[in-house]
Design a protein with these regions (language model features):
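Non-heme Fe(II)/2-oxoglutarate
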Residues: 1-82, 103
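Short conserved micro-motifs at the rims of enzyme active sites and ligand-binding pockets
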Residues: 26, 186, 208-211
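Active-site region of the double-stranded beta-helix
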Residues: 62-89, 93, 99-113, 120-125, ...
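Catalytic core of non-heme Fe(II) oxygenases with the double-stranded beta-helix
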Residues: 99-172, 207-213
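Short beta-strand His + acidic residue motifs that chelate non-heme Fe in jelly-roll/DSBH
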Residues: 104-107, 181-188
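A short hydrophobic beta-strand segment most commonly corresponding to one strand
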Residues: 115-118, 191-207
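Exposed beta-sheet edge/beta-hairpin loop segments within beta-rich domains
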Residues: 163-166, 185-190
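Short, proline-centered helix/strand-breaking motifs
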Residues: 174-179
Length: 215
């Protein structure tokens, strides 16, 4: 009997946060106010893109209380799926606000171990979600260069045309920090702003610092 094996899959986790509406109502007005007041504000690393960033400290800290537990649970669920030993970690992150012309170039989040994106204000019919590139790029490029490109939807070069990977407003996704990704400009010109929260997860102590993940 013949078999096909899809070896070395890339784990991407998605969950819709139940307290999304509350967090959006608190955070988006403040972020839009900052965006209009300081339209050129962006991170130092954002030199090859048309983007805008603000730090966690740019909004009232207690705004995070309504989603903090859900984010931590998602991180621990992702760690359990990966089979990671319990460890202490820190989260570092920032907000992104884009109008329909703005974009983020191809990048990854090394040296973090994995990263997250939370879609706070997002119109899936008009805005673009993050596009992930297939880590097996060498093989795919070889096939395309040999004029026999792969068309199997499980082996695409990126997730742009993956109809199974559709993001909704309120979704949080977690993915390996080494996974290359980009954010194109919006699918069409429109007046609403796209607002996301990006963060990295980095170990800060010995893997033996915690006996087990919380249940």
């Amino acid at each position: 009997m013949a078999d096909f094996f899809t070896l070395f899959p890339t784990p991407v986790y998605r969950v819709n946060l139940s307290n999304h509406k509350e967090f959006k109502e608190k955070s988006v007005p403040r972020l839009i106010e900052l965006f209009k007041k300081e339209p050129d504000k962006k991170a130092k690393w954002a030199t090859m893109c048309h983007t805008w960033q603000a730090g966690f400290n740019d909004i009232v800290p207690n705004y995070f209380e309504c989603i903090q537990k859900e984010v931590d649970v998602a991180i621990e669920e992702y760690c359990r799926f990966l089979g990671l030993p319990p460890f202490k970690y820190e989260k570092t992150g920032w907000f992104n606000v884009h109008d329909s012309s703005m974009y983020q170039e191809v990048h990854n989040h090394i040296p973090a171990i994995f990263s997250g994106i939370y879609y706070i204000q997002f119109d899936k019919t008009k805005d673009s979600q993050a596009i992930f590139r297939n880590p097996s790029e060498t093989f795919l490029s070889l096939m395309a260069g040999s004029k026999v490109p792969i068309s199997n939807p499980m082996l695409l070069q990126h997730t742009l045309f993956d109809n199974n990977f559709i993001i909704e407003e309120g979704d949080l996704i977690l993915f390996p920090a080494s996974l290359d990704h980009l954010v194109p400009k919006a699918k069409q010109s429109h007046d609403q702003l796209r607002v996301t929260l990006s963060f990295n997860v980095t170990p800060i102590n010995s893997v033996n610092a915690i006996k087990e993940w919380q249940k």
